[in-house]
Amino acid sequence: MWKDARADWDVEARDAVDFFLGNHYSQEESDALRAVGQADFVIDRVYAAIEKLKSLLTSRSPKYSAVGREDSDSRMANVWRTLLEYVWDISDGDTQFKQAVHDYATAGMGYLYTYIDPEADYGRGEVKITYLDPFRVYVDPASRNRYADDASGIILSTILTEDQIINMYPQVEAILEDLDTYYDEEDYPSSGKRNSSASFTPDTVYESEYNRVSKYRILERFTKIKVPFYRIFNKQDGSESILDTEKYEKFVQNEQAQLLMTAGLIEIVEVKQTRIKVTATAGDVLLYEQILNTDIYPIVPIPNIWTGTPYPKSDISKVKDSQRLLNKLFSLTLSHAQASA
């Protein structure tokens, strides 16, 4: 349903990507020009402009700043700044950000995704950042927040080959035959232009291996749920603590805590807090469920020309008519020169 809602945006965004790649004419437009003796040449001003924008925005690595709320927090602020720089460094953040800026300028929407790599540092795990192809991300169409904070959910689609899914999810090898193979289409939309620049985009590569490699679609759905927490106030010493459900169950089984509760010296208040739940499925098979200890979606959209919806416009969409005019003028000039020769 969410894919159908953004079908028109897919067409416009793919058209903008084609303009960046130098494919400005559809097959019908190219044939019509040749029928009247005009060439379908392209005087490409879009590519250079986008590359210049990317160069300006990503010429230097970002610098982080953390400020303590009080003077005693200065050391902790330095620790957080160092951690953020470390995460950026191990994630190859410059490359990830450059690709997100590229999607921002061409398709109109870039995405950065924060995740935990459980295999990093010999199993200790690391927090990392990567970019996401905007065509793989499906946002609730009802969202009206620039960063999709009010969305009921975000879906991340990943199409994997058999070898890839076994490598990423070793537990599915035993049930691989139960998973539905996926041959319908790529998340990446097909082009409506003539591929004059011989560009190999995901939709064309997908067709080249169609029916030769088994593929599976993984859907990771991020939703907001309410999770209970417990605020424990000790009237005896004035201390207060916040416990999740697991820690709370252990707390109420503690003999000393039970004595304090019986004496009325412990005040317990249950509060609901928003958290992000991740559910990953492959067809009808549940791969995993996880509740993230945050109320912010780990997928962060970077919209270009904001339209009040999850479907922004790109810089290219604003200059396509000017580029078409330039191409047409050159075609007419060349045709006139040939006729006058």
Residue ranges and their predicted role:
Residues M1-A341:
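Extended alpha-helical, oligomerization-prone segments that build pores/tubes and scaffolds
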